């Protein structure tokens, strides 16, 4: 009671009431907020208030020796009074100006190196061109984009190791630099940043920008490569867009673009080979993009594209759990289904066996130019809300959704037979048969689908069978929306399996990807793609096949010539000769092969007829299955430059020209390499006699110890190998025969073998 009385007295005084009602400081919380803690609550105000003072800055005492007390205008730069509560001097903002003008100059050589990403950004903007601003509705969809142009693709852990090694080389802690890119970057940066005076922490931050890909999930309406994303705030608003052409490209965008092209080429090529999966892996492992191994890029690069994901799956890497159909990425957002085989009849009474999804499901569909939300039940489309850049793009999305729905009216809309095949001439599966059919012509599909009256819903309109918009009617279940559908934001990756035919499945057995989904779009890669695999020789046409085949023989001549004399069949079956067969006229392949093989056999049988140039020239022709015939040829035809060109069996031609003087071979005028020809047959009698019972394998091999003299050979066990010194101080590798019956032929072939092994 006492307290209340006291309060009432206080409030009766008008001043008290005024303070408590009209000022904002009537809350203990507010007073606390501005007075407790070390965190500055209003930095801008504090800064203004501080800078209004004469000496707002404190500095170490040493500053008094480094800066004069007054500047040229006679203004005081520092005060003799100490800063209250610290051992520092009070300094005027004018001192900063003096220091900037007259202080010691440091070397600026490291700035462009450390702040490389910023310097490059300025250059790109300087040379970029900004076009007109257009006002229109922006269909933006959120996509995961790269926000950091000009970076390498290291993982966070790899980058951390590189940064520690470059910036803090003497710090303790295990750092393992394993990948090629890690080692290269570390070496390069250590050299660049020698004697760098910039704060190590700053250097570390900047290195991180250069090494690691940073992605954000942002609303985008145009280009998604990082040089567009860095100016996103300048190029698109809610209702406007500004045209922009970047003033430079960055390697990370080029890598992404070139990776997609390489992956597409490899998947397309693998599809038509006998064992697609093995071929795909062989090509991925032997391909380089911009000088970096493709498999290293695949491990680090998060690009999601059908062909890239097939390559990743083949390498055992995890990929996104969404699946691809008709070039759209489908992600199930709710519902579930079970799969059941069902036979259906097309409008042409052709029977198709399709895997029906039974159950209610909702999907988002995201394509390059259109997006949609799809709700479906068993073989029934309930609703499709689609948005896209133009009529054409919207139509593409509608066709894919209609086929995916597996509705009966879609299957009945098929006119004519379905017999689409893939690159390897295998029939496509029924769902892709239907898709190809309607992608060619969807008129009947749209006419038979059915239309319905529509309600007026904000932001939605109807679409008619001829793909024109309408506010009254629409194709059954279909609406066109102004708003795009966001891409699936999660970066979650799942374990998948891949079969021989490159079909990728998740762990439940759902097909996520197949070669049919790989785009046929051709593009020109920004970075050089080097396919070392012979399977990719034909990508640049017949001439490239011809040159590459002969270059391969010359590069591998050492092993080729030993196989030529010992195991020709294995040599003829080498995959490197496969592309060459497409150049040889079909009718002549077998005859040429039979003729060349017979010729080679004669060379092997008759001493002294070994002719390196001729073997190299004719070898690719021997790879086809031979036909036994008595035919002789003086020239063999290959189809290049749009016509048949001749290779002379004995002698030079424009296709195959060996210059004895320079010992170089040119194929179609392109240099194919240098040849070391065999010397003339000398006296080889002695060695061949002594080397009976031994097989000559080739050049000396250090793993088998020092060279033995011919007398020491008798101690070898059957099948044992050794280096042996022969004739004029040459060393060859030999193996003691396992059977005695073959000894007779040894002395004949030994002469030739020694001669080949020495060269």
From Swiss-Prot:
Chain positions of site Avian adaptation = 627
Q: Which GO terms describe its molecular function?
A: RNA binding; RNA-directed RNA polymerase activity
Entry's Gene Ontology BP terms: 7-methylguanosine mRNA capping; cap snatching; DNA-templated transcription; symbiont-mediated suppression of host gene expression; symbiont-mediated suppression of host mRNA transcription via inhibition of RNA polymerase II activity; viral RNA genome replication
Where would you say this protein principally sits, based on its record?
Answer: virion
Q: Which InterPro entries match?
A: Flu_PB2_2nd, Flu_PB2_6th, Flu_PB2_C, Flu_PB2_CAP-bd, Flu_PB2_middle, Flu_PB2_N, INV_PB2, PB2_helical
Keyword tRNA-binding in the entry? The reply is no
List where the motif Nuclear localization signal lies: 736-739
Keywords recorded for this protein, A-Z? Cap snatching, Eukaryotic host gene expression shutoff by virus, Eukaryotic host transcription shutoff by virus, Host gene expression shutoff by virus, Host nucleus, Host-virus interaction, Inhibition of host RNA polymerase II by virus, mRNA capping, mRNA processing, Viral transcription, Virion
Protein's job = Plays an essential role in transcription initiation and cap-stealing mechanism, in which cellular capped pre-mRNAs are used to generate primers for viral transcription. Recognizes and binds the 7-methylguanosine-containing cap of the target pre-RNA which is subsequently cleaved after 10-13 nucleotides by the viral protein PA. Plays a role in the initiation of the viral genome replication and modulates the activity of the ribonucleoprotein (RNP) complex.
Spell out the family assignment given in the record's similarity comment. Belongs to the influenza viruses PB2 family.
Write the protein's name: Polymerase basic protein 2
Species whose genome carries this gene? Influenza A virus (strain A/Ruddy Turnstone/New Jersey/47/1985 H4N6)
- Organism classification, top ranks? Viruses, Riboviria, Orthornavirae, Negarnaviricota, Polyploviricotina
């Amino acid at each position: 009671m006492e307290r209340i009385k006291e309060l009432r007295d206080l409030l009766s005084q008008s001043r008290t009431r005024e303070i408590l009602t009209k000022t904002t400081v009537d809350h203990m919380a507010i007073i606390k907020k501005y007075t407790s803690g070390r965190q500055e609550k209003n930095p801008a105000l504090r800064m203004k208030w501080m800078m209004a003072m004469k000496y707002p800055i404190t500095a170490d005492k040493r500053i008094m020796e480094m800066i004069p007390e007054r500047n040229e205008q006679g203004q005081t730069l520092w005060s003799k009074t100490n800063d209250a509560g610290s051992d520092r001097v009070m300094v005027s903002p004018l001192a900063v100006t003096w220091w900037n003008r007259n202080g010691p100059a440091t070397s600026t050589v490291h700035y462009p190196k450390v702040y490389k990403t910023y310097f490059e950004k300025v250059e790109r903007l300087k040379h970029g061109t900004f076009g007109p601003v257009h006002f229109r509705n922006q269909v933006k969809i959120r996509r995961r984009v790269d926000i950091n142009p000009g970076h390498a693709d290291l993982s966070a852990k790899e980058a951390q190791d590189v940064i520690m090694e470059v910036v803090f080389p003497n710090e303790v802690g295990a750092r393992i630099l394993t990948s090629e890119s890690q080692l290269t970057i570390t070496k390069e940066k250590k050299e660049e940043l020698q004697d760098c005076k910039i704060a190590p922490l700053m250097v570390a931050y900047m290195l991180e920008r250069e090494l690691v890909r940073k992605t954000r999930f942002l609303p985008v309406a145009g280009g998604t490569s990082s040089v567009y994303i860095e100016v996103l705030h300048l190029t698109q608003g809610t209702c406007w867009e500004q045209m922009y052409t970047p003033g430079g490209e960055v390697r990370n965008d080029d890598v992404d673009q070139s990776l997609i092209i390489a992956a597409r080429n490899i998947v397309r090529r693998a599809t038509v080979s006998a064992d697609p999966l093995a071929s795909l892996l062989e090509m991925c492992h032997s391909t380089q993009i911009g000088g970096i191994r493709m498999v290293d890029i695949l491990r680090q690069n998060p690009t999601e594209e059908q062909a890239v994901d097939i390559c990743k799956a083949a390498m055992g890497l995890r990929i996104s759990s969404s699946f691809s159909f008709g070039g759209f990425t489908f992600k199930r957002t709710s519902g579930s289904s079970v799969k059941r085989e069902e036979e259906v009849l097309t409008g042409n009474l052709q029977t198709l066996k399709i895997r029906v999804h039974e159950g209610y499901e909702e999907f988002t569909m995201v394509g390059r130019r259109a997006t949609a939300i799809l709700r479906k039940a068993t073989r029934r489309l309930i609703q499709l809300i689609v948005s896209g850049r133009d009529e054409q793009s919207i139509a593409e999305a509608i066709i894919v959704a209609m086929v995916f729905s597996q509705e009966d009216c879609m299957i009945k809309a098929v006119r004519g037979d379905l017999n689409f095949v893939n690159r390897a001439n295998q029939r496509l599966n029924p769902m892709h048969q239907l898709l190809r059919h309607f992608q060619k012509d969807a008129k009947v599909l749209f006419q038979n689908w059915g239309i319905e009256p529509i309600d007026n819903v904000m932001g939605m309109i109807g679409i008619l069978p001829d793909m024109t918009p309408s506010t009254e009617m629409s194709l059954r279940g279909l609406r066109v929306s102004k708003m795009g559908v966001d891409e699936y934001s999660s970066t979650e990756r799942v374990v998948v399996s891949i079969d021989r035919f490159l079909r990728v499945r998740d762990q439940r057995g759902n097909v996520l990807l197949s070669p049919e989904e790989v785009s046929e779009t051709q593009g020109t890669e920004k970075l050089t793609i080097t396919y070392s695999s012979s399977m990719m020789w034909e990508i640049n046409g017949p001439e490239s096949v011809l040159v590459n085949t002969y270059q391969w023989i010359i590069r591998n001549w050492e092993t080729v010539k030993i196989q030529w004399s010992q195991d020709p069949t294995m040599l003829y079956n080498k995959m490197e000769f496969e592309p060459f067969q497409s150049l040889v006229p079909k009718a002549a392949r077998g005859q040429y092969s039979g003729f060349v093989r017979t010729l080679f056999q004669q060379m092997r049988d008759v001493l002294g007829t070994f002719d390196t140039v001729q073997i190299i020239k004719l070898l690719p022709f021997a790879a086809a299955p031979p036909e036994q015939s008595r035919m002789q040829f003086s020239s063999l035809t290959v189809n290049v430059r749009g016509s048949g060109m001749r290779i002379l069996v004995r002698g030079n031609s424009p296709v195959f020209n060996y210059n004895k003087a320079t010992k170089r071979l040119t194929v179609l005028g392109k240099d194919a390499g240098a040849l070391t020809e065999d010397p003339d047959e000398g006296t080889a009698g002695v060695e061949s006699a002594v080397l009976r019972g031994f097989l000559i394998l080739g050049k000396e091999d250090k793993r088998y110890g020092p060279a033995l003299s011919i007398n020491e050979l008798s101690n070898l066990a059957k099948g044992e190998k050794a280096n042996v010194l022969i004739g004029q101080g040459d060393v060859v590798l030999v193996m003691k025969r396992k059977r005695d019956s073959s000894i007779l032929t040894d002395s004949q072939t030994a002469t030739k073998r020694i001669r080949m092994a020495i060269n």
